[in-house]
Amino acid sequence: MVIARKGNFGSTNVCAIPDQPITAYVAGDDGSEMPAYVVYRHKGQPPFDWRSAQFREMTFVSPSATNSGLKSTDPALLAEVVALLRDGTPMSLPGISMAGGASMATIRMASDQLPGLLFCPVLRTGPDGTLYVAESLKFDFTSTPLLFQANWIPASPKLTQWLQSR
């Protein structure tokens, strides 16, 4: 639902997020040629803490995988992803180009503590074929060319098996 319009160049939408009060979160269209919605959190709204959230479902999404759309509601697997991100040891991997960042795979995790929004850790395969997961990507403005960086954690055998299933 559009709740406002913004912008000096044309008109872009500010929208309510289903199941979220507009005093907590809204989505704004920050795209230029096409819609690109970004979530904005009110400064008085505490940040979502994925480390302590109870997730109910996760979906693997990848532009290039044949099993994109793979879902799980297994509480043990969901807890393993959170524990891996929270407690795992990050590895240093080469940065990812902007073009490569556009095709990154994610795990979309849904929680009743954040209705209408998702926590989306990113995935990649390392040079040695190992699967890695990270909480988020960071844009490195100091590199040439510009690259995405992350704190990459090797995926557990159970997570790797689930991601390769189907």
Where are these regions (language model features)?
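Function-determining sites in protein domains
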Residues: M1-R166
